[in-house]
From Swiss-Prot:
Protein name per UniProt: Sugar fermentation stimulation protein B
Native species: Escherichia coli (strain K12)
Sorted UniProt keywords: Activator, DNA-binding, Transcription, Transcription regulation
Membership in a protein family: Belongs to the ner transcriptional regulatory family.
Domain of life the protein comes from: Bacteria
Function: This protein is involved in positive regulation of the metabolism of sugars.
SUPFAM superfamilies membership: lambda repressor-like DNA-binding domains
Keyword presence, Secreted: no
Residue ranges for the DNA-binding region feature of this UniProt entry: 50-69
Record-level Gene Ontology MF annotations: DNA binding
Classification via InterPro entries: Lambda_DNA-bd_dom_sf, Ner_HTH_dom
Amino acid sequence: MESNFIDWHPADIIAGLRKKGTSMAAESRRNGLSSSTLANALSRPWPKGEMIIAKALGTDPWVIWPSRYHDPQTHEFIDRTQLMRSYTKPKK
């Protein structure tokens, strides 16, 4: 059965960040990560990275990646924020 939930294309995510005046690398560094780390969220599920990207775009992660937040058996959305490890921003 095919899912009706279509994720944003990675190029659309990158373009959205550019329109907001930022980039994947800049958001990675802003959140205390290596400059290329955040790009992992484009190709595989990573709740923390998805949240960082969504916040930078001014939306929610389930809007960008509905397939990652939808349970096909119960047809409900999953709260994946519970899967995130706690994270404290480094002091500058």
